[in-house]
Amino acid sequence: MSVPVQIATVADHVAGDVFTAAMWTSLEDNINQGIVEQVGVMVKRTTNQAVASASTVTLSFDTDVQDVYGMWALASPTQLVAPVGGWYDVGVQVTWAATSGGGGPFEVRFVQNGTVQVIASTGIQSDGTHATQQQHSCKLYCSVGDVITITVLQRTGGTLNVTGATATLVRV
């Protein structure tokens, strides 16, 4: 999926060109746009998503919180797409339903173009009354059109719901 993005560039000029007021205004606008309209997306999941024990499940998002450059689409709810090349901060916050089972830590995996790049884990609240929350982030270098997905894994012995999740992909 290709997303057209206009990033400010230095205009072509030759030695001796006069820097006009219009050129100054254009440069100022491009700089301000680059600061204010940072390339990034934030999406969230507002309903439960079931995760069977010992199964890797790709998080699916249902709400666009902020998406300046069309990096997420409801038609492909699991995918965050890099519109321009560069370094990105990928972040996720996942809330799991309370469980009284054990089974080891919950895992979050950051996946780039189908390949797992980072695995992060969090110990679980196993008292049966408190939810487990995970918050992880990493830096990934993306080319134009790279697809980032986030998967989760739990090993409690039964199906457990992700009760909420928020993900971000922001160019740094």
Where are these regions (language model features)?
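Extracellular jelly-roll beta-sandwich "head" domains, especially the C-terminal globular C1q domain
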Residues: 2-172
